[in-house]
UniProtKB/Swiss-Prot annotation:
Required cofactor(s): Mg(2+); Zn(2+)
Name under which the protein is recorded: DNA-directed RNA polymerase subunit gamma
Family per similarity comment: Belongs to the RNA polymerase beta' chain family. RpoC1 subfamily.
SUPFAM superfamilies tied to this protein: beta and beta-prime subunits of DNA dependent RNA-polymerase
Record: residues binding Mg(2+): 467, 469, 471
Description of how the protein assembles with itself and partners: In cyanobacteria the RNAP catalytic core is composed of 2 alpha, 1 beta, 1 beta', 1 gamma and 1 omega subunit. When a sigma factor is associated with the core the holoenzyme is formed, which can initiate transcription.
Annotated source species: Rippkaea orientalis (strain PCC 8801 / RF-1)
Amino acid sequence: MKAQADSRFDYVKINLASPERIRQWGERSLPNGVVVGEVTKPETINYRTLKPEMDGLFCERIFGPSKDWECWCGKYKRVRHRGIVCERCGVEVTESRVRRHRMGFIKLAAPVTHVWYLKGIPSYLSILLDMALRDVEQIVYFNSYVVLDPGNASNLSYKQLLTEDQWIEIEEQIYAEDSELYGIEVGIGAEAIQRLLQEINLEEVAEKLREEILESKGQKRAKLIKRLRVIDNFVATNSRPDWMVLSVIPVIPPDLRPMVQLDGGRFATSDLNDLYRRVINRNNRLSRLQEILAPEIIVRNEKRMLQEAVDALIDNGRRGRTVVGANNRALKSLSDIIEGKQGRFRQNLLGKRVDYSGRSVIVVGPKLKIYQCGLPREMAIELFQPFVIHRLIRLGLVNNIKAAKKLIMREDPSVWTVLEEVITGHPVLLNRAPTLHRLGIQAFEPILVEGRAIQLHPLVCPAFNADFDGDQMAVHVPLSLEAQSEARLLMLACHNILSPATGKPIVAPSQDMVLGCYYLTAENPKAQKGANRYFGSIPDAIKAYEQGTVDLHAYVWLRYNGDVVTHKPDTEVLKTETLDDGSVIKHYRERRVREKDGEVISQFIRTTPGRIIYNKTIEDALVAL
């Protein structure tokens, strides 16, 4: 197994495991030739000696020693006895960490169905058997018999369900003196399901289904295609349908379901141990009942209980009553450990913490460029620490790493100067979960800011589906030159204007920006302080607003010699004034124009300081491009 773990591989494939494969996982030969792996006892540890019980759920012979280089009985201690198998207890002297990957197995006295394939959506067992899920459940949980071979009976058919009373009636007919019935076989429970699955010839059924699909349509055709798809997948993966019925159950390594002693001498244990214990107890009881040739009804009841125990172990609560522990809390099964946000995949494998990353709340940074983000100093010094230390040593400010770290801890002014130099031109990646499309991660040039929040340009929010009501974002530092150049060329926010899904612009003003634009250009008849004043230039008007002599929404006259476009044509002269120098002032609705001999000398337009600021901001932005 170690050799397999060390070797490189391209992908991981999840497949159905055969009973032989499950045995191989848990079964192994000790150096002295003894084969171990089967867990036969429900005990965990001896509460007097606090040592694992042999052949139990924490058995050292099966899973390896609890202490490094020490056998169960204590005869062999120290690393010099590496690989020796103790003659007294049969434990191999090795490291205790093998208990994290060595598995065991439970050999079941009767086969049981896998609850995922029975109660999953869709139910693969019912699809393969071409039976209703309700009927398959009736068979599995010992409520109905199924005809495995109708023999010469004219009133029976293959896979027909029979109640207890119906089967008793048929039995009486079979064993009657004048009976001509023979070859009739019925079954119940997972054994019957296993037999039905074993009789399926996948290639023949697939060929037959393809012919039927060509001739059928509608709902029937969809059902046939669904069944064919499942069968084709079984053929492609070289899996047998009867592997969905378990005869051997794997026992996961003990260090993945630990038992911990608490201060008061009590023990805290993983729920899995309780679920495994239920399976082993019922399995052992069933074995004893079979040995003593107990009545069929008792054996059948025990088989049903074993099926329910295995169901609870694999997926507690999927079918029937949920198994609960102390305080009526549902026990966590294998499925509960794997699935969901807190499961093994999303929490521990996909959601691993990585170096050179940080996380903080985002706030709006209105003065940032679209390709910039505000990075808190506290976070930046931690993320870029190796780069800062390297530069401090290269500049001769310190002689070694330890001195550089002390300088950083003291927050010496030279550190901030060096940090500024380091982050210049070094992009960082910002990610907001959930990352549903590629624009969920983008690159930005960091700008050092005070505080503890990451500042984000409001225009990139739609791409991240972010808002500023408490959202958090993660920061990652690309380390290699290739990663940095890729981030700069492909992932910089200013290169991601269009949505990759639709091709439409994803960068669009929203929320505060739209509100701000509306507020600047809106009318407010009540705020008319300084109205009807004349200004010779845009800077004069803005200065007057900043000094508080004019309200933002007050109508003023601004000298402007460019073209004026209004939503309604402004060509109607309301009034004309003739001045002493012969020039004429024409009063329009939105402007006043002074002309002489047909030439325009000056033009004043009616506007507000808010609209002047809005127009100037857009003009400056366009000039900057």
